[in-house]
Amino acid sequence: GVQSSASAVAGAAPASSLAAAVRAPKRRSADQPSSRATMPVAERFVSINGEGTCAGKLAAFIRFTGCNLRCGYCDTMWANVPGAAAKDEAPEQLAAWVRQTGVECVTLTGGEPVLQPLLPQLVELLLGEPGPNGRGLRVEIETNGAADLGELAALRARVGDAAPGSLSFTVDWKLPSSGMEQQMLPANFRLLGARDTVKFVCGQGDLPRALEVARQLDLPGRVPVYLSPCFGDIEPARIVEFMQENQMTWATAQVQLHKVIWPDVERGV
């Protein structure tokens, strides 16, 4: 995930040729209803991916408004609240924008993107794009673990290798410090494989639970697992120590790069 404002993004954009792609969308007022044929976009921009298997790589981010959770440490609450400012854009418009950016990695985030009824349509369009190098786009959906992934997993299985692009899921398991663990859907995690990622954002006291859940869901060796610190609540070194103490050779400790590079920027990075 990633965040920031249009002016901040313009200053942080990796290349001037991407400047047009980094513009924040025009906003509709909170009381203007979203068209059924469009999706509510809080922001879209190009930056580096801050976490996961594509960390450090340029990516086109599309952030949708709305979320079904209220995590205590949420850093994108501005996009989650009812009536959050957004621009209504059709899937075809978003696919055209991604094409314009000239980047290979695409991250669909939020909010909670899986709540968007038109997300499967957008994903199918993106998977059909040839991408800048003719190898297709690497499409990633960042999701909170509490929205059913069944339809999207079925789409991935149906499309298979017929489309040039690839689809992966980065799925959170919310730990006790989030206040949302009871909302997790274990069935989602049975749909995941080697191309996907399970992410645990850890606060003080969460690490033993993360290990317990990883084992219960049979994640080690089946799905890549990332452990990230809840900034300001736990030192990253403690995560490394816990991994050492428990021989967690199958897990990866990771800090969010965008928060290291732009610690005071909230949107567009």
Language model region names:
Residues 22, 26-28:
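Alpha/beta catalytic barrel-like cores
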Residues 48-50:
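A detector for short, charged/polar N-terminal pre-domain segments
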Residues 18, 29, 35, 39-46, ...:
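Conserved Radical SAM active-site core
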Residues 6-8:
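Residue-level detector of structural "landmarks"
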Residues 11-21:
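Short alpha-helix boundary/capping segments
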Residues 52-55:
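S-adenosyl-L-methionine
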Residues 95, 115-269:
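Conserved AdoMet/S-adenosylmethionine-binding subsite of the radical SAM
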